[in-house]
Every structure is written in C-alpha cells, then in structure tokens.
Curated annotation (Swiss-Prot):
Residue numbers annotated as active site: S165, H191, D287
SUPFAM superfamilies referenced in this protein's UniProt entry, alphabetically: CheY-like, Methylesterase CheB, C-terminal domain
Name the record gives this protein: Protein-glutamate methylesterase/protein-glutamine glutaminase
Family according to the record: Belongs to the CheB family.
Chain positions with 4-aspartylphosphate modification: D56
Response regulatory domain span: 5-122
Annotated organism of origin: Photorhabdus laumondii subsp. laumondii (strain DSM 15139 / CIP 105565 / TT01)
Gene name for this UniProt entry: cheB
Domain of life where this protein originates: Bacteria
Primary location recorded for the protein, binned into one broad class: cytoplasm
UniProt-recorded Gene Ontology molecular function terms: phosphorelay response regulator activity; protein-glutamate methylesterase activity; protein-glutamine glutaminase activity
Domain (CheB-type methylesterase) ranges: 153-345
Chain's role: Involved in chemotaxis. Part of a chemotaxis signal transduction system that modulates chemotaxis in response to various stimuli. Catalyzes the demethylation of specific methylglutamate residues introduced into the chemoreceptors (methyl-accepting chemotaxis proteins or MCP) by CheR. Also mediates the irreversible deamidation of specific glutamine residues to glutamic acid.
GO biological process, one term: chemotaxis
Amino acid sequence: MNKITVLCVDDSALMRQIMREIINSHSDMEVVACAPDPLVARDLIKKHNPQVLTLDVEMPRMDGIDFLEKLMRLRPMPVVMISSLTAKGSEITLRALELGAVDFITKPQLGIREGMLAYSELIAEKIRTAAQAKLSVPIITPVSSAPLSFKPLLSSEKLIAVGASTGGTEAIKNLLQPLPVTSPALLITQHMPPGFTRSFAERLNKLSQITVKEAENGERILPGHAYIAPGDRHMELCRNGADYQVLITDAPAVNRHRPSVDVLFRSVAKFAGKNAVGVLLTGMGSDGAAGLLEMKQAGAYTLAQDEASCVVFGMPRAAIQMGAVDEVMDILKMSKRMLAKISSGQAVRI
C-alpha cells in the first residue's frame, strides 16, 4: 500500500516534530519533509512532490495565506491549515478555505504536545480526506450578483435545513449569496470547532442579503434569517406554540460529530415535516444521510450536491445510496431550486 506523503510547514520546531510524530504513527501516511517557512517549502515541494501539505497560518518571511494564494495558482495541491484558536486565527483560516485549502486543524492554546497528540486520529482523518479531495473545483462565484426573486411566503412554517462538512464553507457561501431577504429561514450545521462558527456567520452575513448569525438557544426562528450551529454544540429545531425555536444542546457526539447534521435533520423531520427542504452538501463520511432520509419520509423535498461541484462527495453519496435524495445538482443551481420547492405546496401545521 502506498503511503500518503505529507510535507509539514511550520516555523515552530516543536510543531514540526509533533506533526512528524503524529503522522508517522499512522501506517498509511508519512512525513517526507518539514520546512520552517514557505520559501524552504517551495523547494521541498519540487523535490518530494508530496500529496498533502500541512501549513501554519502565521509565519515569518511569508505568511501562510500569501503562500497558499501563490501555491493554489501555480501548483494546486491539497492543503490542511494549522490555525490558532483566536478571532484573528479564525478569520485567516476562513480566508484560507476561500482560497482553496481543504480543511484546518486548530492548535490547542495550552499544552501543545498533549493537545496535538490527543487530536492524532482527527489529524490523520483530515489528511486522508485532503488526499482524496478534488482540487479541480474552482473558487466559485455566483453566476449573477443580483439576488433571486422570491415572493414572501404567507406562512412561516416553511424552512430549509442544510448540512455540510469538508468544503462546506464555500458551498454554503454560494448557497446563501443569491437568496433574497424574502427567503424562508435556514438552519445550517457545518462541522466546525468552537470559536470559528461566529466568525463564519459574520463573514456570511457581510456577503448575503439575508441575515446570517450564530444560533442561540431558545431564539425564535424568523424568515430571511440563516442560523449557524455553534461549534461543539448540537442544533435542533423545536416548537414553542405557533413558533419555531432553536434548541442548542451539549448532548454526546453523533457520528463522531458535534454539531451533527443528523441531529438537525431529524428534528426538522419531526417538527417541520413536509414544510421543509433538506440540503446535504460536500463532506467526508455519512453524517446527515440518515437524517435526510427521515426528512424525506416525513414529506420534505431533499437535495444533494453533485460530485462534480463537491470537494469531497462522501456525505451526498451516502445519502444517495440510502435513497434519501430527491434530486442531485450543482451547488450553483441549488439556491433557485430549493426556493422553487419551498414555495410549491401549501404549508401544513405539524
């Protein structure tokens, strides 16, 4: 079996040593070289032709973002960013994902060695995912900057539930940007650690016509708003009389994820049923597939992103194989389609 070859770029000798230790402890991957900065990395990429690059966000001589931008333009390859758990770190990381990085790993703020070693399985999984990720997907911009037209719904019973993982930050951006302020509410679960979801929501809010925010426990769900599940918390739909409400919980991980897409979709199947549209986007694994099937069985219309526009086709593929998907389509056509489906049919009180 050929091992996944990895080049680690980090200005910290300790981090380079830890990453080498972690990666080499897995039988299906190995570190072929380490670089203290992007300028050294450039030569090592030519020499070793690694399959995956791990890249520190903040470095001297040339920072990770500048290097990533040049790399994705001149020599595209799968990149996993190593980021700090700070507001600045999360902003830079989201920019890196926009530029084409496949995923990111967060450095613990205290006890670097112990913290990183505890992430060993997660790091290995992200490297495996990166090695399989599709890089031919361009940085997508909506076909038209003009928002879609959508007649306001007479009922606030209608809503859209969205789930995503690897590659999802850009897919969600492309899903939300064309939506007009008259859109129904959206509940979105994107696999992401705490500290990043607020920055992600704020970034989307600046780019969208609708209001995008990190979800808060107990808040009323309103049309024209998108609610992002907070990192490391599950988000569910619930009811309070005639209104939909957000429920945020610390329940155990589902499918090894918190937030979990299945948790969101199952609650939407229960409380919204045929008033909902379910959307499953790019991501590794199968989280969301079973929940999407429950939504379909409850009468919801279900959509999955197609393989050609996915960074990783795992989650949509699992849902398709399970018979959970009504329609498979390109991410750029999905906004219009989900609005068309949500406006067809009468709202039914569940």
